[in-house]
Regions:
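RNA-binding accessory domains that recognize and position tRNA/RNA substrates
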Residues: 1-172, 178, 187
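N-terminal Rossmann-like NAD(P) cofactor-binding module of classical short-chain dehydrogenase/reductase
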Residues: 184
Length: 189
């Protein structure tokens, strides 16, 4: 399976526990945090892991990829993200399909569960994932204001690769004061 670094860093998953149905995860490790000429991460969809946890069926303790600098386990520990493996993720997916989203926790063995599970829907997830200040990328004849509601880095890259000056603003920013040719409102949680 490819794409777990991108999925884990996708702001759209903020506050959620990600349950992956592909049977083997971790086999190619995690790439470096390098940035491109625009100051955008080359390998991730944002600056950090946004999920609150990861549930997988089988974890590969050995990884192999020319671009890997650490294991998935090391990366998740660095960012204090809990994970669990050895779980029938396809059965969980069936339950979610039939019943809709559910609250949940990943609890270390021997520890007690919290009496009340935090509901991430009570938090303003867009405020959590949005940039906190205006950020400019690239240069060009056309200027586009991007309202950041949880934008992925690949969307930023798509604009600047096409010669657009991109002005990324927080979700609650008064962009009407700016000079721009186009407006893009990103997706998010």
């Amino acid at each position: 399976m490819v794409g777990y670094p991108e999925s884990l860093t996708d702001p759209s998953y903020s506050g959620q526990i990600l349950c992956v149905t592909y049977p083997l995860i971790g086999n190619y490790g995690v790439p470096d945090e390098g940035i491109d000429q625009y100051g955008i991460s080359k390998n991730f969809e944002s600056e950090k892991i946004w999920v609150r946890g990861l549930v997988i069926s089988e974890y590969s303790f050995k990884y192999s990829h020319w671009d890997a600098v650490k294991s998935l386990d090391e990366w998740m520990k660095e960012q204090k993200i809990p994970g669990i493996y050895g779980v029938d993720t396809r059965e969980i997916t069936k339950m979610l399909r039939d019943n809709g989203s559910m609250l949940g926790q990943i609890i270390p063995e021997g520890e007690a569960a919290e009496e009340e599970v935090h509901d991430p829907n009570t938090d303003n997830q867009i405020d959590i994932v949005s940039c906190k200040e205006v950020i400019r990328y690239g240069s060009g004849d056309k200027k586009v204001v991007l309202v950041d509601c949880g934008v992925k880095h690949n969307i930023l890259r798509c604009f600047v690769d096409r010669g657009v000056e991109l002005i990324r603003v927080p979700w609650d920013y008064d962009f009407l004061t700016l000079d721009y040719d186009g407006l893009f409102i990103s997706n998010g949680p």
